């Protein structure tokens, strides 16, 4: 592993921000640190950067323990959420700042700055000041400045949080492509699930100072190993007694059932339902327009479920009785999560 954290603990007063954190990151990977507020993800990033010191444990980069190495000597580029650009410096001088501190030759600085501005798509803006740039352009300057000294590791603290939605979407794709091109090992902090899934090669899920799960976006989303990870993604409906729903195995010591919108199919009484005999009757309580389609809130057996339908399907109204089929659900037992499939999926289909 290129970056390793071994049994890291960190307290802020009585608050335990990192609780025996142990994780490894391969060289060249783009890693997303994902979790709710207060889960410890930013603390991990700041300890790797040298901006905070762990109470115990080891931080290792490229085989070397760096706990006692000052932040300025770690060879790490850091992109702050607020950009942290120098207001009274031009774009050129902002990008060149670290190189000047390192006393690099003027011709080398000029060449490197122009190379990076071309890389981030800001050629020709060298003489502008941060106040003359858009939010997306400022963030690109911050990326270029962090990359200027050729860091061995790039850290990004919620890099898209201060940017509007459209530009944020564009920058996600741009960042992923840029880091793949450069091959620099990178770690970014986010609380945005979609952002982590879209950008990261691997995701580290944090919760209450601990690592919940590590895996590819597909693995952590589709195969959660803990109750927290199963409930964290999407807009799940969480309820206690799932035995009221048909055709699911009953697990001993089951605690909660977790049903995501994509696990639910809602059809009008007049529509074809592949699993009609296994469907439950529900009553629609909410119908909301979303950019991707229609979102429904349907009460079934006393449980309020969220489901989605496309625009080209027949319209469903509030108060309408509908057929609801649950394909699958996660069931938690203690801290583990098990995926259960509706038994009807394994049986011959009768279309009614």
For each of these PLM feature ranges, what is it?
Residues 30, 71-77, 81-225:
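ABC ATPase nucleotide-binding domains
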Residues 34-36:
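The feature captures the beta-strand-to-loop junction immediately N-terminal to the Walker
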Residues 237-287, 311-352:
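Glycine/charge-rich catalytic "coupling/switch" loops of P-loop NTPases
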Residues 57-65:
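Conserved ABC transporter NBD signature motif
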Residues 42-45, 141:
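ABC ATPase nucleotide-binding domain helices that frame the ATP-binding cleft
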Residues 49:
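Helix-to-loop junction immediately C-terminal to a conserved catalytic motif
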């Amino acid at each position: 592993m290129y970056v390793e954290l071994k049994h890291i603990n960190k307290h802020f007063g009585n608050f335990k921000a990192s609780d025996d954190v142990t994780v490894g990151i391969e060289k060249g990977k783009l890693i997303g640190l994902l979790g709710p507020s207060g889960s410890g993800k930013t603390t991990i990033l700041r300890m790797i950067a040298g901006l905070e010191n762990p109470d115990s444990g080891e931080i290792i980069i490229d085989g070397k323990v760096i706990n006692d190495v000052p932040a300025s000597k770690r060879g790490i580029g850091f992109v702050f959420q607020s950009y942290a650009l120098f207001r009274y410096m031009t774009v050129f001088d902002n990008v060149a700042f670290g190189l000047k501190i390192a006393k690099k030759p003027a011709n080398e600085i000029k060449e490197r700055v122009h190379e990076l501005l071309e890389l981030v798509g800001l050629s020709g803006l060298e003489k502008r000041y941060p106040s003359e740039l858009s939010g997306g352009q400022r963030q690109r300057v911050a990326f270029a400045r962090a990359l200027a000294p050729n860091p061995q590791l790039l850290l990004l603290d919620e890099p898209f949080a201060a940017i509007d939605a459209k530009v944020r979407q564009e920058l996600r794709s741009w960042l992923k492509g840029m880091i793949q091109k450069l091959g620099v090992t990178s770690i970014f902090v986010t609380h945005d699930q979609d952002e982590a899934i879209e950008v990261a090669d691997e995701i580290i899920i944090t919760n209450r100072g601990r690592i919940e799960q590590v895996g590819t976006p597909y693995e952590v989303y589709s195969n959660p190993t803990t109750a927290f990870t199963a409930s964290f993604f999407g807009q799940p409906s969480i309820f206690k007694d799932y035995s009221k729903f048909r055709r699911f195995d009953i697990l001993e010591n089951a605690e909660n059932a977790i049903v995501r919108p994509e696990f639910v199919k809602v059809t009008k009484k007049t529509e074809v339902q592949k699993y009609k005999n296994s469907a439950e009757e529900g009553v629609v309580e909410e119908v909301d327009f979303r950019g991707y389609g229609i979102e429904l809130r349907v009460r079934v057996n006393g449980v309020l479920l969220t489901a989605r339908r496309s625009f080209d399907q027949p319209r469903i109204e509030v108060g309408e009785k509908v057929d609801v089929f649950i394909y699958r659900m996660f069931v938690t037992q203690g801290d583990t999560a098990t995926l259960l499939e509706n038994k009807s999926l394994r049986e011959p289909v009768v279309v009614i």
